[in-house]
């Protein structure tokens, strides 16, 4: 396994990314009808986190691939 010190923490590597991630989190929670807070279930929080990851991957794919659409095998 590679020795990657940043793999065990949630430290953001891009300055200013925290605000964008928080905005995305609340937008997605609103779309899903999830009220974020201490009383929110892990399943609801997980659905928001999973969607954030999905959208970030899509953004990265668009930037790296020049905006090409996804093809299926």
UniProtKB/Swiss-Prot annotation:
Keyword annotations for this protein, in alphabetical order, are: DNA-binding, Sporulation
Q: What top-level branch of life does the organism fall under?
A: Bacteria
MF GO annotations: double-stranded DNA binding
Q: Which PROSITE patterns match?
A: SASP_1, SASP_2
Q: Where is this site: Cleavage?
A: 27-28
Short name of any one Pfam family annotated for the protein: SASP
Q: Give yes or no: UniProt keyword Nucleotide-binding.
A: no
Q: What InterPro entries does UniProt report for this protein, alphabetically?
A: SASP_alpha/beta-type, SASP_alpha/beta-type_CS, SASP_DNA-binding, SASP_sf_alpha/beta
An annotated GO BP: DNA topological change
What protein family does this chain belong to?
A: Belongs to the alpha/beta-type SASP family.
An additional note in the Swiss-Prot or TrEMBL entry is: SASP are degraded in the first minutes of spore germination and provide amino acids for both new protein synthesis and metabolism.
This molecule's function is given as: SASP are bound to spore DNA. They are double-stranded DNA-binding proteins that cause DNA to change to an a-like conformation. They protect the DNA backbone from chemical and enzymatic cleavage and are thus involved in dormant spore's high resistance to UV light.
User: What protein is this chain from?
Assistant: Small, acid-soluble spore protein C2
| Originating organism | Priestia megaterium
């Amino acid at each position: 396994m590679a020795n990657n010190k940043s793999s065990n923490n949630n430290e953001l590597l891009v300055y200013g990314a925290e605000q964008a991630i928080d905005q995305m989190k609340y937008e997605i929670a609103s779309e899903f009808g999830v009220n974020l807070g201490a009383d929110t279930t892990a399943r609801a929080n997980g659905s928001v986190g999973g969607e954030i990851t999905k959208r970030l991957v899509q953004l990265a794919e668009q930037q790296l691939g020049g905006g090409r659409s996804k093809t299926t095998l």
